[in-house]
Design a protein with these regions (language model features):
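Short, glycine-/small- and polar/acidic-enriched structural segments
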Residues: 23-147, 152-155, 171-174, 191-192, ...
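Pocket-lining segment of extracytoplasmic ligand-binding domains
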Residues: 79, 153-154, 159-246
């Protein structure tokens, strides 16, 4: 009875407005996607604590910042979370989203002779180590019955990969939106493989153990705002694209494509999500990206997911 009463009080507290806090929540973002959604949806109004934003070009440096405690929370994909967790990062996934994984793709120049995944044999593929692009390359090769030794993976950050593809230093680039949409629209590339059928489409907000303990109320409030903004963005791609274009300098038409095709939406962290994440980790083990089998269950914290609107 006492435990039930305590759970009731916690549930009630989660619905109450957060009192003004002196805390600063340090938030990691990629290409300002989360910030763009929050600004466009009005979710950054009347925030009763400070938010300090840190922008990253990819998930790998964001994961490193989480591991170092330089940020409290940040958004990253399923594979980067595994990569960071396997490296010993004291972080937990505290909320989840799912998108249509057509927003992950291996792209090649229009004039390339590469037409499908099988044609990647013997080719050079650029990607960012530990990213969802890295995962896509590994999963696509396995699906096509190719080994990692059948290709040359060149690890680099997105800006360098984009240049390498344009100059012909690599044959293909395994990446994610907005980079996929940007290269399709501005560099005349096409997709030879995407994440449909090989990727869960899951992404997460991950927080440090310290932030979960010391900034619990601020973190819970922030995650509720993110989920509300993501739901709003589903039916307002033009507004989100316009705001994010002003923030990032990326073309609004490209960003509209990103939001329309991803259909990113919040999902609860449940046993099914954890099982999908385990399969992703097991693929990384088979590909020798991580060296020992990883039990992903401890990398999740369900308490915030259960209070999301």
């Amino acid at each position: 009875m006492r435990r039930a009463y305590v759970r009731f009080l916690v549930a009630i507290a989660a619905t109450l407005p957060l009192a003004v806090s002196a805390a600063t929540l340090k938030v990691g973002d990629q290409q300002l996607q989360t910030r763009g959604i929050l600004e466009a949806s009005g979710q950054l109004k009347d925030v009763p604590y400070q938010i300090e934003w840190f922008n990253f070009p990819a998930a790998q440096p964001l994961g490193e910042a989480l591991n170092a405690g330089a940020i409290d929370v940040g958004g990253l994909g399923d594979a980067p979370l595994i990569f960071a967790y396997s490296a010993g990062a004291k972080i937990r996934a505290v909320s989840a989203t799912r998108s249509t994984p057509v927003d992950l793709a291996i792209v090649v120049p229009d004039a390339s002779p590469i037409r499908n995944a099988a044609d990647l044999k013997g080719k050079r593929i650029a990607t960012t180590r530990g990213s969802i692009g890295h995962y896509l390359a590994v999963a696509t090769l396995e699906h096509a019955n190719l080994k990692l030794t059948d290709v040359t993976l060149s690890y680099m950050q997105p800006v360098d990969a984009q240049a390498a593809l344009a100059t012909g230093s690599v044959d293909a680039w395994s990446t994610w939106d907005p980079y996929v949409a940007l290269t399709e629209a501005r560099q005349h590339t096409r997709s030879v493989a995407n994440g449909v059928g090989v990727s869960s489409g899951l992404s997460f907000e991950a927080a440090t153990d310290t932030a979960i303990r010391d900034k619990h109320a601020e973190l819970a409030d922030f995650l509720r705002r993110v989920a509300a903004g993501q739901r709003w963005a589903l039916s307002h791609p033009d507004e989100v694209a316009a705001i994010q274009s002003r923030v990032t300098g990326l073309p609004a038409d490209v960003l509209k494509t990103v939001y329309q095709r991803a259909q990113l939406h919040p999902v609860p962290i449940d046993n099914g999500v954890i099982a999908e994440q385990q399969r992703t980790a097991d693929l990384y083990l088979r590909a020798d990206v991580i060296k020992t089998r990883l039990d992903v269950a401890p990398s999740f914290d369900k308490q915030f997911s259960s209070t999301a609107p």
